[in-house]
Amino acid sequence: MKIVVKLGGSLMKEGVPSSFIEDISALSSTHQLILVHGGGDVVTEYANRLGKEQRFVVSPEGIRSRYTDGETAEIYQMVMAGLLAKRLVLSLTKAGVKSLSLSGTDGSLLQGRRKSKLVVVDERGRKVAIDGGYTGKVQGVNSSLLDLLLSQGYVPVISPVATSEAAEPLNVDGDRAASAVATGTGAEAVAFLTNVDGLQLNGSLVRHMTPSEASESLPKIGFGMQKKVMAAVEAVEGGVKEALICSGTRSSPLTSALAHDTCTVISVQ
């Protein structure tokens, strides 16, 4: 079974959970696993250390994202593809897992389209258009490269940096990048591991949703979970059998999610 796993930035901030590494080690012998990691809070931390104040913008839909100018794009790559990816690979290596880290720019793994403009809400609540910076959306995935690594027993670790048509690095959303990888490689499942059990509505964990039900819930949830739900819907609509939103801090987090234990499942049925 081919599974794409997105390890959320909230988990990377505290260091890679040992329970997650142990679970990947156990599952890697019987499943083909592809990891995509986040790490936005760590990017902000290192940008501040370097004296580069970070700017965040909010879309008319209420989704908050980092504004990525040229200097921020360099810091983003350094932290994501350098520090965090290697930290994850070293943890996997220590557990006996063959892994290899790739930025989405390596081998044109993630091909993206640079956004020329961003429509954001200013401090007065007005919609304004600003330069898109080095932000984009994944348009294509080099699935043959990933299939080659999987055939040799590797667990690919992907940093969410895409390559534009002009060979520029692009900051792309990690959740939606994981969705694109799952769709592009024909994965059976994509799991979004975060620091909560799944989607909560009215104080209760949502166990299952169809893509249409999940889309309808978007106005009711916070921006962090919004991105995961949007990515989950995109994956299922793209042919992935199921998308799972689950906690990465519990024992055997991926195994539990695949068993639909205390998580949110988004699927057609």
Predicted feature locations:
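C-terminal catalytic "cap/lid" subdomain
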Residues: M1-R64, T68-Q269
